[in-house]
Amino acid sequence: MGLFDFSVKELHDKLVKKEISPFDLVSESFNRIESVEDKVGSFITLNKEAAFGVAEELGDAGIDPNNMLAGLPIGIKDNIVTKSLRTTAASKILENFDPIYDATVVSKLKNAQTINIGKLNMDEFAMGSSTETSYFHKTHNPWDLSRVPGGSSGGSASAVAAGEVLFSLGSDTGGSIRQPAAFCGVVGMKPTYGRVSRFGLIAFASSLDQIGPITKNVEDNAYLLEAISGLDANDSTSINQPVERFSDSLTGDIKGLRIGVPKEYLGEGVDPGVKQAVLDALKTLEKLGATWDEVSLPHSEYGVASYYILASSEASSNLSRFDGVRYGYRSPNATTLEELYTKTRSEGFGDEVKRRIMLGTYALSSGYYDAYYKKAQQARTLIKQDFVNVFENYDVIIGPSSPTTAFKIDGMINDPITMYSNDILTVPINLAGVPAISVPCGFSDGLPVGLQIIGNYFEESLLYKVAHAFEQETTFHKEKPNL
């Protein structure tokens, strides 16, 4: 049994009693990376020397019994800036970017005395659902190396599933935590928009982006969200909501819970194996005293279309800062200012990023703004209202995290429309801004299936309670890939 088979709480107790040391945990992490990283490719940059240095300092000082995460190894998605540790967003244009400050979540993790093992691979600028658009390399799913780990936080999910780190941070703009968590058989939480500061997150779509935790089990996830949540003066969209002790909600008691199951989430396009795993999960929840009804989120069909208009529009604005002038890649072939812009961006961005910048620029252009961007915003309002309506009568909404299990590497990369359509069950949650968690709920042909539990605004505690109750009745979260 490896050290990462223990939970956060178990490892904390061992550290406090000095049965193990932070140095042991960091060694476990790097030994595992040495063993499997060539197969999975979870990381872009390793932080080995600094990680061992922090581990030794913490070991000498002793672990604070009240600091649950102290001494535990974490991986951080490479679009979250880390002071003096290369942060690339998996793009050539930021290949050698060395940030001069920490993201708020990184500062919070340092205060919690976690140990940063390194920066995790992702789709370039978080644009993708497979971690195939990374400038550096593709990441492979630990359950089947011929398949994708999901995206855009593919490295964050694969590193946890492969046992390279105990837990990780990802970001979720349209499903980028929940879908890879589902594909890799781990737990991923997309918090309410504004629950976690975005300061230091390299922006893709500012009205949709949210940082969240990826872990092996629900309890660990709750501890990690506690550590990174809270109001931040540096982020005007962070919300002044008390930081709850999410771990206190894990009572196992969900008697009387009212579940809404959208007919749109189990209809055409959902793999039979995925649908069956979700229906079996609902039976488990019924045994625990919950009830469920079929409900409707009638405007879900507009989710993907409106999401890709809005996200691409915001990206076209956010990514205009990468021009070769102040930081990042600069084309050596430019002789005029105009060439500096065009060549730097043409050479520095990958195909998917350029596709979305062009789509967003088109949607915002004067002749098409009303037809596309304005209409997408109107659809977003309707989608948001759908959730408000259902939550008047139900406590949570449940469906699959993804309509399929992990697909083959190179299977969709040249078919962007099919790839985009795969986000159909996750993007409405980001458009509405509500929280959702993906937990392992079974297997289909040997590949993990994720159960998506969606809550009302700032009801992460309830999501953790439901997810934990389900987890305690099943063993899916204990299954590990054979690497």
Curated annotation (Swiss-Prot):
Keywords: ATP-binding, Ligase, Nucleotide-binding, Protein biosynthesis. PROSITE patterns: AMIDASES (PS00571). One of its GO terms (molecular function) is ATP binding. It comes from the Bacteria. The active site is at K77 (charge relay system), S152 (charge relay system), S176 (acyl-ester intermediate). It is an enzyme of class 6 (ligase). It catalyses: L-glutamyl-tRNA(Gln) + L-glutamine + ATP + H2O = L-glutaminyl-tRNA(Gln) + L-glutamate + ADP + phosphate + H(+). Signal peptide: none annotated. GO terms for cellular component: glutamyl-tRNA(Gln) amidotransferase complex. Heterotrimer of A, B and C subunits. Belongs to the amidase family. GatA subfamily. HAMAP family: GatA. Allows the formation of correctly charged Gln-tRNA(Gln) through the transamidation of misacylated Glu-tRNA(Gln) in organisms which lack glutaminyl-tRNA synthetase. The reaction takes place in the presence of glutamine and ATP through an activated gamma-phospho-Glu-tRNA(Gln). This is Glutamyl-tRNA(Gln) amidotransferase subunit A. It comes from Listeria monocytogenes serotype 4a (strain HCC23). The gene is gatA.
